Amino acid sequence: MLLRWHSVIPLFLAMTVAFPNTYRTVVEDLPAIPEGWVQGNPPSPETSVRMNLAVGQQNTRTFEQIVLDISTPGHRNYGKHLSRRDLKGLLRPRRETSNLILSWLEKSGVPKRSIVDDGDWIHFVISISQAERMLQTRFYHFHDVQDPGISMIRTLKYSVPSRLARHVYMIQPTTKFGKPKKHANSIANLQAIYLSTNATENCNATITPRCLRELYKMGDYVAKPDCRNVIGVSGYLDQYARYSDFYKFLELYAPEMKGANFSVAHIGNGQNLQNSTRNSIEASLDIEYALGLSNASAVFYTTSGRGPLVPDLDQPEQEHNSNEPYLDQLHYLLSLPQEALPAVLSTSYGENEQSVPERFSHATCNLFAQLGARGVSVIFSSGDSGVGSSCLTNDKKKITRFNPTFPASCPFVTSVGATFKINPERATGFSSGGFSDRHSRPGYQNDAVQHYLDKLGDRWKGLYNPKGRGIPDVSAQGANFAIYDHGKVIIVSGTSASAPAFAAIIANLNAIRLRANKPVLGYLNPFIYGKGREGFTDIVHGGSKGCVGYSSTNRSTPAVPYASWNATEGWDPVTGVGTPNFRILAKIVQHME
Protein backbone atom coordinates (compact mmCIF):
# COMPACT_ATOMS: atom_id res chain seq x y z
CA MET A 1 0.00 0.00 0.00
CA LEU A 2 1.38 3.41 -0.95
CA LEU A 3 1.18 6.31 1.49
CA ARG A 4 0.78 9.90 0.34
CA TRP A 5 3.20 12.43 1.76
CA HIS A 6 0.78 13.80 4.35
CA SER A 7 0.39 10.28 5.77
CA VAL A 8 4.04 10.02 6.77
CA ILE A 9 4.13 12.99 9.15
CA PRO A 10 2.91 10.92 12.14
CA LEU A 11 5.47 8.24 11.26
CA PHE A 12 8.34 10.71 11.38
CA LEU A 13 7.00 12.32 14.56
CA ALA A 14 6.97 8.89 16.15
CA MET A 15 10.47 8.32 14.87
CA THR A 16 11.80 11.43 16.60
CA VAL A 17 10.28 10.23 19.88
CA ALA A 18 11.85 6.81 19.48
CA PHE A 19 15.22 8.35 18.63
CA PRO A 20 15.80 11.47 20.76
CA ASN A 21 18.26 14.00 19.34
CA THR A 22 20.27 14.32 22.56
CA TYR A 23 23.91 14.85 21.66
CA ARG A 24 23.11 14.45 17.99
CA THR A 25 23.05 16.86 15.07
CA VAL A 26 20.70 16.60 12.10
CA VAL A 27 22.71 16.51 8.87
CA GLU A 28 19.88 16.68 6.32
CA ASP A 29 16.14 17.18 6.81
CA LEU A 30 13.58 17.37 4.00
CA PRO A 31 10.34 19.25 4.79
CA ALA A 32 8.22 16.69 2.91
CA ILE A 33 8.46 13.89 0.39
CA PRO A 34 9.57 15.44 -2.91
CA GLU A 35 6.93 15.89 -5.59
CA GLY A 36 6.42 12.84 -7.73
CA TRP A 37 7.13 10.24 -5.04
CA VAL A 38 4.92 8.30 -2.61
CA GLN A 39 5.96 6.28 0.41
CA GLY A 40 5.60 2.53 0.50
CA ASN A 41 6.54 -0.14 3.00
CA PRO A 42 9.79 -0.38 4.98
CA PRO A 43 12.50 -2.48 3.36
CA SER A 44 13.64 -5.71 4.93
CA PRO A 45 15.96 -4.95 7.88
CA GLU A 46 18.56 -7.26 6.31
CA THR A 47 18.66 -5.33 3.04
CA SER A 48 22.20 -4.12 2.34
CA VAL A 49 22.91 -0.62 1.11
CA ARG A 50 26.14 0.94 -0.11
CA MET A 51 26.65 4.33 1.52
CA ASN A 52 28.87 7.21 0.39
CA LEU A 53 30.03 9.53 3.17
CA ALA A 54 31.44 12.92 2.18
CA VAL A 55 34.00 14.03 4.74
CA GLY A 56 33.77 17.70 5.75
CA GLN A 57 36.51 19.70 4.04
CA GLN A 58 38.33 22.59 5.67
CA ASN A 59 40.10 23.87 2.55
CA THR A 60 37.36 23.97 -0.09
CA ARG A 61 38.07 27.55 -1.15
CA THR A 62 41.79 26.87 -1.44
CA PHE A 63 41.10 23.84 -3.62
CA GLU A 64 38.68 25.75 -5.86
CA GLN A 65 41.22 28.52 -6.36
CA ILE A 66 43.81 25.94 -7.40
CA VAL A 67 41.35 24.60 -10.00
CA LEU A 68 40.75 28.11 -11.31
CA ASP A 69 44.49 28.82 -11.53
CA ILE A 70 45.12 25.59 -13.45
CA SER A 71 42.32 26.50 -15.84
CA THR A 72 42.96 30.21 -16.46
CA PRO A 73 45.07 30.97 -19.56
CA GLY A 74 47.95 33.26 -18.68
CA HIS A 75 48.31 32.00 -15.11
CA ARG A 76 51.69 30.46 -14.34
CA ASN A 77 49.96 27.18 -13.39
CA TYR A 78 47.74 26.99 -16.47
CA GLY A 79 47.53 23.47 -17.84
CA LYS A 80 49.40 21.89 -14.91
CA HIS A 81 46.68 19.36 -14.20
CA LEU A 82 46.90 17.30 -11.03
CA SER A 83 47.50 13.58 -10.85
CA ARG A 84 45.20 11.40 -8.77
CA ARG A 85 47.87 11.13 -6.08
CA ASP A 86 48.40 14.90 -5.94
CA LEU A 87 44.67 15.57 -5.83
CA LYS A 88 44.06 13.06 -3.06
CA GLY A 89 46.95 14.49 -1.09
CA LEU A 90 45.48 17.96 -1.43
CA LEU A 91 42.01 16.92 -0.28
CA ARG A 92 42.84 14.28 2.32
CA PRO A 93 41.35 15.23 5.70
CA ARG A 94 43.31 15.27 8.92
CA ARG A 95 44.09 11.82 10.27
CA GLU A 96 42.10 12.48 13.44
CA THR A 97 39.02 13.29 11.34
CA SER A 98 39.25 10.02 9.44
CA ASN A 99 39.90 8.07 12.63
CA LEU A 100 36.84 9.56 14.34
CA ILE A 101 34.58 8.62 11.44
CA LEU A 102 36.06 5.15 10.98
CA SER A 103 35.76 4.43 14.70
CA TRP A 104 32.10 5.50 14.65
CA LEU A 105 31.38 3.27 11.66
CA GLU A 106 32.98 0.22 13.24
CA LYS A 107 31.25 0.79 16.59
CA SER A 108 27.97 1.11 14.69
CA GLY A 109 28.41 -2.38 13.29
CA VAL A 110 29.71 -1.58 9.82
CA PRO A 111 31.79 -4.57 8.67
CA LYS A 112 35.40 -3.45 8.51
CA ARG A 113 35.94 -5.36 5.27
CA SER A 114 33.24 -3.27 3.56
CA ILE A 115 34.79 0.12 4.45
CA VAL A 116 36.79 1.90 1.76
CA ASP A 117 38.61 5.01 2.97
CA ASP A 118 39.18 7.18 -0.10
CA GLY A 119 40.26 10.27 1.78
CA ASP A 120 37.60 12.91 1.23
CA TRP A 121 34.97 10.18 0.79
CA ILE A 122 34.40 6.99 2.75
CA HIS A 123 32.30 4.18 1.25
CA PHE A 124 30.77 1.31 3.20
CA VAL A 125 28.10 -1.40 3.02
CA ILE A 126 25.62 -1.79 5.86
CA SER A 127 22.24 -3.36 6.53
CA ILE A 128 19.12 -1.20 6.76
CA SER A 129 18.65 -2.04 10.43
CA GLN A 130 22.21 -0.97 11.23
CA ALA A 131 21.87 2.20 9.15
CA GLU A 132 18.67 3.12 10.99
CA ARG A 133 20.38 2.77 14.36
CA MET A 134 23.50 4.58 13.22
CA LEU A 135 21.65 7.51 11.63
CA GLN A 136 18.63 7.40 13.98
CA THR A 137 16.09 7.34 11.21
CA ARG A 138 13.67 5.07 9.36
CA PHE A 139 14.06 4.02 5.74
CA TYR A 140 11.16 3.27 3.40
CA HIS A 141 10.57 2.28 -0.16
CA PHE A 142 9.51 5.34 -2.14
CA HIS A 143 7.80 4.86 -5.50
CA ASP A 144 7.83 7.06 -8.59
CA VAL A 145 4.27 8.30 -9.20
CA GLN A 146 4.71 8.27 -12.98
CA ASP A 147 6.41 4.86 -13.03
CA PRO A 148 5.50 2.82 -9.90
CA GLY A 149 7.96 0.17 -11.03
CA ILE A 150 10.77 2.53 -10.03
CA SER A 151 11.43 2.60 -6.30
CA MET A 152 14.19 3.85 -4.04
CA ILE A 153 15.05 3.17 -0.43
CA ARG A 154 15.27 6.60 1.14
CA THR A 155 14.57 8.65 4.28
CA LEU A 156 13.64 12.27 4.92
CA LYS A 157 15.99 12.99 7.80
CA TYR A 158 19.10 11.63 9.47
CA SER A 159 21.56 12.66 12.14
CA VAL A 160 25.02 11.86 13.45
CA PRO A 161 26.61 12.23 16.89
CA SER A 162 27.25 15.92 17.51
CA ARG A 163 30.97 15.32 17.99
CA LEU A 164 31.06 14.21 14.33
CA ALA A 165 28.84 16.94 12.89
CA ARG A 166 31.65 19.05 11.44
CA HIS A 167 33.41 15.99 10.06
CA VAL A 168 30.46 14.33 8.28
CA TYR A 169 29.24 16.59 5.48
CA MET A 170 26.78 14.17 3.88
CA ILE A 171 25.80 10.51 3.64
CA GLN A 172 23.99 9.20 0.54
CA PRO A 173 21.82 7.52 -0.65
CA THR A 174 19.49 8.88 2.01
CA THR A 175 17.61 12.07 1.09
CA LYS A 176 18.39 12.27 -2.65
CA PHE A 177 15.15 11.36 -4.44
CA GLY A 178 15.46 12.97 -7.84
CA LYS A 179 16.51 10.95 -10.83
CA PRO A 180 18.27 12.42 -13.84
CA LYS A 181 16.03 13.19 -16.81
CA LYS A 182 17.03 12.90 -20.43
CA HIS A 183 17.03 16.43 -21.81
CA ALA A 184 14.46 15.91 -24.54
CA ASN A 185 12.29 18.84 -25.52
CA SER A 186 9.38 19.30 -23.11
CA ILE A 187 7.97 22.70 -24.05
CA ALA A 188 7.57 22.61 -27.83
CA ASN A 189 6.49 18.94 -27.42
CA LEU A 190 8.30 17.86 -30.56
CA GLN A 191 7.75 14.22 -31.39
CA ALA A 192 10.22 11.85 -33.02
CA ILE A 193 9.69 11.92 -36.78
CA TYR A 194 10.65 8.92 -38.88
CA LEU A 195 12.30 9.77 -42.20
CA SER A 196 13.62 7.85 -45.14
CA THR A 197 17.39 7.44 -45.18
CA ASN A 198 17.68 9.43 -48.41
CA ALA A 199 16.01 12.59 -47.09
CA THR A 200 17.39 15.73 -48.73
CA GLU A 201 19.68 17.68 -46.42
CA ASN A 202 18.28 21.11 -45.55
CA CYS A 203 20.04 22.58 -42.54
CA ASN A 204 17.15 24.87 -41.66
CA ALA A 205 14.91 21.82 -41.39
CA THR A 206 17.25 19.00 -40.35
CA ILE A 207 20.64 19.11 -38.64
CA THR A 208 23.39 16.65 -39.58
CA PRO A 209 27.13 16.59 -38.86
CA ARG A 210 27.74 18.30 -42.21
CA CYS A 211 25.40 21.15 -41.22
CA LEU A 212 27.29 21.65 -37.96
CA ARG A 213 30.65 21.56 -39.73
CA GLU A 214 29.55 24.34 -42.06
CA LEU A 215 27.78 26.42 -39.43
CA TYR A 216 30.60 26.30 -36.88
CA LYS A 217 33.41 26.71 -39.43
CA MET A 218 34.94 23.27 -38.93
CA GLY A 219 35.43 22.59 -42.63
CA ASP A 220 36.82 19.14 -43.32
CA TYR A 221 38.96 19.02 -40.18
CA VAL A 222 39.25 15.45 -38.89
CA ALA A 223 41.38 14.80 -35.84
CA LYS A 224 43.58 11.75 -35.63
CA PRO A 225 42.59 9.40 -32.78
CA ASP A 226 44.83 9.94 -29.77
CA CYS A 227 44.73 7.98 -26.50
CA ARG A 228 45.32 11.27 -24.66
CA ASN A 229 42.18 12.79 -26.19
CA VAL A 230 39.30 10.52 -25.23
CA ILE A 231 35.74 11.86 -25.35
CA GLY A 232 33.49 10.27 -22.74
CA VAL A 233 29.72 10.02 -23.11
CA SER A 234 27.51 9.41 -20.06
CA GLY A 235 24.77 6.80 -20.25
CA TYR A 236 22.10 6.56 -17.54
CA LEU A 237 18.56 5.16 -17.25
CA ASP A 238 19.20 1.99 -19.24
CA GLN A 239 20.15 3.86 -22.40
CA TYR A 240 22.21 1.58 -24.63
CA ALA A 241 24.56 2.73 -27.41
CA ARG A 242 24.14 0.27 -30.27
CA TYR A 243 27.07 -0.38 -32.57
CA SER A 244 24.89 -1.26 -35.57
CA ASP A 245 23.01 2.06 -35.34
CA PHE A 246 26.27 3.96 -34.85
CA TYR A 247 27.93 2.43 -37.92
CA LYS A 248 24.87 3.12 -40.06
CA PHE A 249 24.76 6.74 -38.86
CA LEU A 250 28.39 7.25 -39.93
CA GLU A 251 27.66 5.67 -43.30
CA LEU A 252 24.73 8.04 -43.88
CA TYR A 253 25.91 11.30 -42.35
CA ALA A 254 29.65 11.18 -41.59
CA PRO A 255 31.36 8.85 -44.08
CA GLU A 256 34.64 10.67 -43.50
CA MET A 257 34.59 9.13 -40.00
CA LYS A 258 34.38 5.56 -41.28
CA GLY A 259 36.40 3.40 -38.93
CA ALA A 260 35.56 5.44 -35.84
CA ASN A 261 34.50 3.34 -32.88
CA PHE A 262 33.82 3.47 -29.16
CA SER A 263 34.44 1.24 -26.18
CA VAL A 264 32.16 0.73 -23.19
CA ALA A 265 32.94 1.14 -19.48
CA HIS A 266 30.45 -0.58 -17.18
CA ILE A 267 29.96 1.29 -13.89
CA GLY A 268 28.08 -0.32 -11.01
CA ASN A 269 26.83 -3.19 -13.18
CA GLY A 270 25.71 -0.82 -15.93
CA GLN A 271 24.99 -2.62 -19.18
CA ASN A 272 24.98 -1.87 -22.90
CA LEU A 273 22.57 -4.42 -24.32
CA GLN A 274 22.69 -4.59 -28.10
CA ASN A 275 19.40 -6.44 -28.63
CA SER A 276 17.19 -4.54 -26.22
CA THR A 277 13.93 -3.14 -27.60
CA ARG A 278 14.03 -0.22 -25.14
CA ASN A 279 14.14 3.34 -26.42
CA SER A 280 17.80 4.37 -26.83
CA ILE A 281 17.36 7.70 -28.60
CA GLU A 282 19.45 9.55 -26.00
CA ALA A 283 22.41 7.18 -26.20
CA SER A 284 22.30 7.11 -30.00
CA LEU A 285 22.15 10.91 -30.21
CA ASP A 286 25.04 11.40 -27.80
CA ILE A 287 27.49 8.87 -29.20
CA GLU A 288 26.66 9.56 -32.87
CA TYR A 289 27.32 13.30 -32.67
CA ALA A 290 30.22 13.13 -30.22
CA LEU A 291 32.09 10.88 -32.66
CA GLY A 292 30.47 11.98 -35.91
CA LEU A 293 32.06 15.40 -35.44
CA SER A 294 35.32 14.58 -33.67
CA ASN A 295 36.73 11.17 -34.66
CA ALA A 296 38.25 11.12 -31.17
CA SER A 297 38.75 7.95 -29.20
CA ALA A 298 35.52 7.48 -27.26
CA VAL A 299 34.16 5.66 -24.21
CA PHE A 300 30.48 5.18 -23.41
CA TYR A 301 30.17 5.18 -19.61
CA THR A 302 27.07 3.16 -18.79
CA THR A 303 26.02 3.54 -15.17
CA SER A 304 23.60 1.09 -13.56
CA GLY A 305 19.97 2.07 -13.47
CA ARG A 306 16.91 -0.13 -13.63
CA GLY A 307 18.36 -2.97 -15.65
CA PRO A 308 19.23 -6.53 -14.62
CA LEU A 309 21.60 -6.71 -11.68
CA VAL A 310 24.41 -9.15 -11.04
CA PRO A 311 24.64 -9.24 -7.22
CA ASP A 312 27.91 -8.55 -5.46
CA LEU A 313 28.97 -7.32 -2.03
CA ASP A 314 28.21 -3.72 -2.95
CA GLN A 315 24.85 -4.50 -4.56
CA PRO A 316 23.69 -7.84 -3.16
CA GLU A 317 19.99 -7.46 -3.97
CA GLN A 318 17.94 -6.18 -6.90
CA GLU A 319 16.05 -3.76 -4.65
CA HIS A 320 19.35 -2.04 -3.85
CA ASN A 321 19.78 -1.19 -7.53
CA SER A 322 18.83 2.46 -7.00
CA ASN A 323 22.21 4.09 -6.53
CA GLU A 324 22.78 7.74 -7.36
CA PRO A 325 24.34 7.65 -10.86
CA TYR A 326 26.25 10.95 -10.56
CA LEU A 327 28.14 9.73 -7.51
CA ASP A 328 28.78 6.27 -8.92
CA GLN A 329 30.13 7.67 -12.18
CA LEU A 330 32.21 10.42 -10.57
CA HIS A 331 33.87 8.14 -8.03
CA TYR A 332 34.65 5.67 -10.80
CA LEU A 333 36.23 8.32 -13.01
CA LEU A 334 38.25 9.89 -10.21
CA SER A 335 39.65 6.47 -9.30
CA LEU A 336 41.20 6.11 -12.77
CA PRO A 337 44.87 6.82 -13.46
CA GLN A 338 45.58 9.93 -15.51
CA GLU A 339 46.11 8.06 -18.75
CA ALA A 340 42.67 6.40 -18.49
CA LEU A 341 40.66 9.59 -17.90
CA PRO A 342 38.60 11.11 -20.71
CA ALA A 343 39.73 14.58 -21.78
CA VAL A 344 36.09 15.56 -22.39
CA LEU A 345 32.96 14.24 -20.67
CA SER A 346 29.56 14.96 -22.24
CA THR A 347 26.37 14.41 -20.23
CA SER A 348 22.85 15.13 -21.45
CA TYR A 349 20.93 14.56 -18.24
CA GLY A 350 19.81 16.77 -15.37
CA GLU A 351 17.04 17.71 -12.97
CA ASN A 352 15.58 20.74 -11.25
CA GLU A 353 18.15 22.18 -8.87
CA GLN A 354 15.64 22.39 -6.03
CA SER A 355 14.91 18.66 -6.30
CA VAL A 356 18.49 17.96 -5.21
CA PRO A 357 19.39 18.23 -1.49
CA GLU A 358 21.63 21.24 -1.04
CA ARG A 359 24.53 19.35 0.48
CA PHE A 360 24.34 16.82 -2.32
CA SER A 361 24.58 19.54 -4.96
CA HIS A 362 27.66 21.07 -3.31
CA ALA A 363 29.39 17.73 -2.70
CA THR A 364 28.74 16.61 -6.28
CA CYS A 365 29.88 19.94 -7.67
CA ASN A 366 33.13 19.48 -5.74
CA LEU A 367 33.64 16.17 -7.55
CA PHE A 368 33.13 17.89 -10.90
CA ALA A 369 35.79 20.40 -9.81
CA GLN A 370 38.10 17.48 -9.05
CA LEU A 371 37.68 16.23 -12.61
CA GLY A 372 38.52 19.72 -13.82
CA ALA A 373 41.65 19.72 -11.68
CA ARG A 374 42.72 16.54 -13.44
CA GLY A 375 42.20 18.03 -16.89
CA VAL A 376 38.69 16.89 -17.83
CA SER A 377 36.31 19.25 -19.65
CA VAL A 378 32.96 18.45 -18.00
CA ILE A 379 30.05 19.41 -20.27
CA PHE A 380 26.34 19.27 -19.41
CA SER A 381 23.23 20.15 -21.36
CA SER A 382 21.39 23.02 -19.67
CA GLY A 383 17.94 21.41 -19.84
CA ASP A 384 14.74 21.70 -21.83
CA SER A 385 12.32 23.57 -19.56
CA GLY A 386 13.11 27.16 -20.55
CA VAL A 387 12.84 29.50 -17.56
CA GLY A 388 11.18 26.69 -15.65
CA SER A 389 8.40 24.14 -15.75
CA SER A 390 6.66 23.99 -12.37
CA CYS A 391 7.91 27.47 -11.37
CA LEU A 392 7.03 26.71 -7.76
CA THR A 393 9.41 26.20 -4.84
CA ASN A 394 9.21 22.80 -3.17
CA ASP A 395 9.69 24.12 0.36
CA LYS A 396 7.04 25.12 2.89
CA LYS A 397 6.73 28.58 1.31
CA LYS A 398 5.51 27.32 -2.10
CA ILE A 399 6.31 30.59 -3.85
CA THR A 400 6.48 31.29 -7.58
CA ARG A 401 10.06 30.93 -8.79
CA PHE A 402 11.97 30.25 -12.00
CA ASN A 403 13.62 26.80 -11.85
CA PRO A 404 17.36 26.50 -12.57
CA THR A 405 18.70 23.04 -13.39
CA PHE A 406 21.44 20.87 -11.88
CA PRO A 407 24.23 19.88 -12.59
CA ALA A 408 24.22 22.72 -15.15
CA SER A 409 24.18 25.15 -12.21
CA CYS A 410 27.50 23.86 -10.85
CA PRO A 411 30.21 26.46 -11.61
CA PHE A 412 32.70 23.68 -12.43
CA VAL A 413 30.81 22.29 -15.39
CA THR A 414 30.26 23.95 -18.77
CA SER A 415 26.53 24.14 -19.44
CA VAL A 416 25.27 24.20 -23.03
CA GLY A 417 22.00 25.78 -24.17
CA ALA A 418 20.26 25.27 -27.51
CA THR A 419 19.80 27.27 -30.71
CA PHE A 420 17.95 26.53 -33.94
CA LYS A 421 17.76 27.89 -37.49
CA ILE A 422 20.73 29.31 -39.39
CA ASN A 423 21.50 32.74 -40.84
CA PRO A 424 20.85 33.79 -38.15
CA GLU A 425 20.84 31.26 -35.34
CA ARG A 426 18.13 31.82 -32.75
CA ALA A 427 17.63 30.77 -29.14
CA THR A 428 15.10 27.95 -28.78
CA GLY A 429 12.10 28.36 -26.52
CA PHE A 430 12.93 25.20 -24.58
CA SER A 431 16.58 26.01 -23.79
CA SER A 432 16.96 26.08 -19.99
CA GLY A 433 18.85 28.86 -18.31
CA GLY A 434 18.74 31.30 -15.46
CA PHE A 435 20.54 31.70 -12.17
CA SER A 436 21.40 29.16 -9.49
CA ASP A 437 19.77 29.36 -6.07
CA ARG A 438 22.56 27.17 -4.61
CA HIS A 439 25.81 28.26 -6.21
CA SER A 440 27.02 31.85 -6.13
CA ARG A 441 28.21 33.58 -9.27
CA PRO A 442 31.88 32.74 -9.94
CA GLY A 443 34.35 35.54 -10.57
CA TYR A 444 34.97 34.55 -14.18
CA GLN A 445 31.30 35.36 -14.92
CA ASN A 446 31.01 38.66 -13.08
CA ASP A 447 31.45 41.11 -15.94
CA ALA A 448 29.43 39.14 -18.49
CA VAL A 449 26.48 38.39 -16.21
CA GLN A 450 26.37 41.81 -14.58
CA HIS A 451 26.21 43.40 -18.03
CA TYR A 452 23.06 41.39 -18.70
CA LEU A 453 21.51 42.15 -15.31
CA ASP A 454 22.11 45.87 -15.74
CA LYS A 455 20.08 45.77 -18.95
CA LEU A 456 17.39 43.54 -17.42
CA GLY A 457 16.65 45.93 -14.58
CA ASP A 458 13.71 44.98 -12.35
CA ARG A 459 12.09 42.62 -14.82
CA TRP A 460 11.40 39.25 -13.17
CA LYS A 461 12.58 40.64 -9.81
CA GLY A 462 11.95 38.13 -7.04
CA LEU A 463 11.66 35.20 -9.43
CA TYR A 464 15.39 34.44 -9.60
CA ASN A 465 18.64 34.92 -7.68
CA PRO A 466 20.65 37.75 -9.30
CA LYS A 467 23.75 36.70 -7.32
CA GLY A 468 23.63 33.10 -8.53
CA ARG A 469 25.80 31.31 -11.06
CA GLY A 470 24.49 32.13 -14.55
CA ILE A 471 23.31 29.32 -16.84
CA PRO A 472 24.25 28.40 -19.59
CA ASP A 473 27.84 29.21 -20.52
CA VAL A 474 27.58 28.53 -24.26
CA SER A 475 25.10 27.15 -26.77
CA ALA A 476 24.92 25.08 -29.93
CA GLN A 477 22.29 23.81 -32.32
CA GLY A 478 19.70 21.69 -30.51
CA ALA A 479 16.68 21.24 -32.77
CA ASN A 480 15.81 18.70 -35.45
CA PHE A 481 18.91 16.47 -35.28
CA ALA A 482 18.92 13.44 -37.55
CA ILE A 483 20.01 10.32 -35.67
CA TYR A 484 19.86 6.59 -36.35
CA ASP A 485 18.21 4.39 -33.72
CA HIS A 486 16.68 0.92 -33.91
CA GLY A 487 17.22 0.83 -37.66
CA LYS A 488 15.47 4.12 -38.43
CA VAL A 489 16.37 7.74 -39.04
CA ILE A 490 14.71 9.85 -36.36
CA ILE A 491 14.55 13.62 -35.83
CA VAL A 492 15.07 14.68 -32.21
CA SER A 493 15.47 17.98 -30.37
CA GLY A 494 16.79 19.18 -27.04
CA THR A 495 19.90 20.47 -25.33
CA SER A 496 20.74 16.75 -25.28
CA ALA A 497 21.86 17.36 -28.86
CA SER A 498 23.74 20.58 -28.08
CA ALA A 499 26.02 19.05 -25.43
CA PRO A 500 27.68 16.26 -27.50
CA ALA A 501 28.01 18.59 -30.50
CA PHE A 502 29.86 21.13 -28.38
CA ALA A 503 31.90 18.38 -26.69
CA ALA A 504 33.05 17.15 -30.09
CA ILE A 505 34.32 20.63 -30.96
CA ILE A 506 36.29 20.74 -27.70
CA ALA A 507 37.79 17.33 -28.51
CA ASN A 508 38.95 18.71 -31.87
CA LEU A 509 40.51 21.72 -30.12
CA ASN A 510 42.29 19.34 -27.77
CA ALA A 511 43.71 17.50 -30.78
CA ILE A 512 45.17 20.77 -32.05
CA ARG A 513 46.76 21.50 -28.67
CA LEU A 514 48.21 18.01 -28.31
CA ARG A 515 49.72 18.25 -31.79
CA ALA A 516 51.40 21.46 -30.61
CA ASN A 517 52.72 19.65 -27.50
CA LYS A 518 50.35 21.51 -25.20
CA PRO A 519 48.03 20.07 -22.53
CA VAL A 520 44.33 19.54 -23.14
CA LEU A 521 41.97 22.40 -22.27
CA GLY A 522 40.50 20.86 -19.10
CA TYR A 523 37.99 22.92 -17.14
CA LEU A 524 36.74 25.36 -19.78
CA ASN A 525 34.87 28.22 -18.15
CA PRO A 526 37.73 30.62 -17.30
CA PHE A 527 38.86 30.23 -20.94
CA ILE A 528 35.35 30.74 -22.35
CA TYR A 529 34.77 33.98 -20.45
CA GLY A 530 38.35 35.14 -21.00
CA LYS A 531 40.71 34.53 -23.91
CA GLY A 532 38.26 32.31 -25.73
CA ARG A 533 35.38 34.78 -25.76
CA GLU A 534 36.15 36.09 -29.26
CA GLY A 535 35.77 32.55 -30.59
CA PHE A 536 32.01 32.54 -29.95
CA THR A 537 29.26 34.01 -32.10
CA ASP A 538 26.85 36.11 -30.06
CA ILE A 539 23.21 35.03 -30.45
CA VAL A 540 20.81 37.98 -30.29
CA HIS A 541 17.56 36.52 -31.61
CA GLY A 542 14.91 34.42 -29.90
CA GLY A 543 14.38 33.56 -26.27
CA SER A 544 13.24 30.89 -23.87
CA LYS A 545 9.74 30.26 -22.55
CA GLY A 546 8.22 28.58 -19.52
CA CYS A 547 6.03 28.93 -16.42
CA VAL A 548 2.97 28.26 -18.56
CA GLY A 549 0.71 27.06 -15.74
CA TYR A 550 1.40 23.33 -15.66
CA SER A 551 4.40 21.19 -14.77
CA SER A 552 6.13 18.52 -16.84
CA THR A 553 3.80 16.03 -15.13
CA ASN A 554 0.75 18.10 -16.18
CA ARG A 555 0.00 19.37 -12.68
CA SER A 556 -1.42 22.85 -12.22
CA THR A 557 1.32 25.35 -11.30
CA PRO A 558 1.69 29.14 -11.17
CA ALA A 559 1.71 30.82 -14.56
CA VAL A 560 4.00 33.78 -15.23
CA PRO A 561 2.71 35.66 -18.30
CA TYR A 562 5.35 36.10 -21.02
CA ALA A 563 8.05 34.50 -18.84
CA SER A 564 11.23 34.42 -20.89
CA TRP A 565 14.97 34.95 -20.96
CA ASN A 566 15.71 36.80 -24.19
CA ALA A 567 18.81 36.34 -26.30
CA THR A 568 20.58 39.70 -26.32
CA GLU A 569 23.94 41.27 -27.06
CA GLY A 570 26.55 39.69 -24.80
CA TRP A 571 25.99 36.84 -22.37
CA ASP A 572 22.38 35.90 -21.72
CA PRO A 573 20.66 33.12 -19.71
CA VAL A 574 19.44 31.23 -22.74
CA THR A 575 22.48 31.03 -25.07
CA GLY A 576 25.39 31.99 -22.79
CA VAL A 577 28.21 33.75 -24.64
CA GLY A 578 27.06 32.18 -27.91
CA THR A 579 27.91 29.37 -30.32
CA PRO A 580 31.45 28.21 -31.19
CA ASN A 581 33.46 29.32 -34.21
CA PHE A 582 35.96 26.49 -34.59
CA ARG A 583 38.23 28.36 -37.00
CA ILE A 584 38.81 31.22 -34.55
CA LEU A 585 39.00 28.98 -31.48
CA ALA A 586 41.59 26.77 -33.18
CA LYS A 587 43.87 29.77 -33.73
CA ILE A 588 43.46 30.85 -30.11
CA VAL A 589 44.16 27.50 -28.46
CA GLN A 590 47.08 26.59 -30.71
CA HIS A 591 49.30 29.23 -29.11
CA MET A 592 47.60 29.67 -25.74
CA GLU A 593 49.76 29.28 -22.66
Swiss-Prot record:
Binding annotation for Ca(2+): 538-539, 570, 572
Residue ranges constituting the Peptidase S53 domain according to the UniProt record: 206-592
GO MF annotation terms: metal ion binding; serine-type endopeptidase activity; tripeptidyl-peptidase activity
EC number: 3.4.14.10
Entry superkingdom: Eukaryota
Record SUPFAM superfamilies: Protease propeptides/inhibitors, Subtilisin-like
Propeptide intervals in chain numbering: 19-198
Compartments in which it is found: Secreted, Extracellular space
Cofactor(s), names only, from the UniProt record: Ca(2+)
Catalyzed reaction equations: Release of an N-terminal tripeptide from a polypeptide
Job description of the protein: Secreted tripeptidyl-peptidase which degrades proteins at acidic pHs and is involved in virulence.
Name recorded for this polypeptide: Probable tripeptidyl-peptidase SED3
Species annotation: Arthroderma benhamiae (strain ATCC MYA-4681 / CBS 112371) (Trichophyton mentagrophytes)
Gene symbol of the encoding locus: SED3
